[in-house]
Amino acid sequence: TPVIESTGTGGGMKLFCAGVGVNHPDITNASRVIKEGEIELCKKNGVTEIIEIVIGNDGLTLAHSLEASNADFNQEQLYLALADEVPVNGQFVKNPFQKWSEIDPSLPDHKIEVLVAPPTSGTRDAWDSLIMVKGCKAAGAYDMWSELGEKAKKKCRISREDGRVIEAGENDALIVQKLTEDPERFGYFGYSYLLVNEDKIKPTSIAGIEPTLEGIQDYSYPIARPLQFYVKKAHIGSVPGIEEFLQEFTSSRAMGEDGYLTDIGLVALSDDDAVSYTHLRAHETYT
């Protein structure tokens, strides 16, 4: 009997990379690409051949209550609202902004409060890459940290801890509930969760662009991301059912434009990007 667990991307990767054999996961889904440190952990534990399969796309959605006024933010504004330290007059200071309008008079004149995913979540990692790091660069902070090299990106990802940024766990339903309780509050999650809660919440625009299926598929929406899963090559052919599962998961009836996964929010790959199990060898293998 298949065993399915919800762990978040980071937690899933730890379990996946813990070893080979029936006591360890065969497959892990991920809302971000596997990290170098995770590849090294896999190698350390004998997981030496990992196949990556991109199954579709998703768009992070920054949402708020239907009762709220429409809002539009760019990456720089979001970084300045959420970062632990921000550049002011050429110097870094602890984030002083309490209202959005203090960042830009065109923004809402109410408190900054954003519900975010936990650090172990692939959604949080995608948000930090697509919003915090890009916003950090636009604000000039990244260049000011240039002597740190790659560590500059880590600095860009650090969120403030004064109550303006609130970790809300992996429970998207709870985030939706909290958004409906306060029209000044924002929170983010995957596009599919917006679709099933359109009677309660609405999206903000990012740099003037609202999340749509088309915008996510062609990546014109600024915070679109790929979704993928990872499978242990060593388990294919030795663990019953894996080949059949892969054939089904990558079939057009599942992940195609009219597939049943699109009915629950998956944004299908374009025809040029579409894959099937018979073409797995053309995809990235980490060894």
Predicted regions: what is each one?
Residues 1-281:
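Flexible loop/hinge segments at secondary-structure junctions
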Residues 282-287:
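A short, hydrophobic C-terminal helix/tail in secreted or cell-surface proteins
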